[in-house]
């Protein structure tokens, strides 16, 4: 989810937002429900200690579950009596392998990593353009296929995120099918197992449309957004909604976001 994090406006807005969320989160408590948290990257913090510390604190308030278990509970419309949390990460940065996966394994659960095959296979020029102009996240490197295959063999789920982190809210069906369908085929070829999960890039409901969602639903068993978190579903029940977070966020922020009563 690209953001111009270097702008003065963004920095001031983030500062004010942090203060408000820290106050609200101090008095918030995660509510019963199935919560899928979606992250992307590390920033400048010390890792994996920061992420490990966040999960240690969060585990005092919620129960961590496997990603596929969360999906099953949501799609069968279960109503748990405690807050359940599963994790996904978009874009396939190297910290998924180096940091996020090992820490999550310490809790006996997994996560789903949504990846872009052309980013994985791109030369440095492609990678730099992807980082600076597509996802606006500086100085990143993608996971390699051997690392992704290892994660899959360790029980992590690998999902599709289009070939090029493409915004799918257009009407060019040929391009949409390339970005959505071809992505699935490449992942399945590389991993030797079905790819059932798709998360559309950028995540807002306005950044997809009925045509692209229908193509995705024809191709994958499950489709995900990163929007409208208070509701389990969007696009008339076709899309499962996730809640954005980042591993360097304060625990108060997560406590506040998880305090919503989901419908």
What are these regions (language model features)?
Residues 142, 162, 173, 177:
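Acidic, His/Gly-enriched loop-helix segments that form or flank divalent-metal centers
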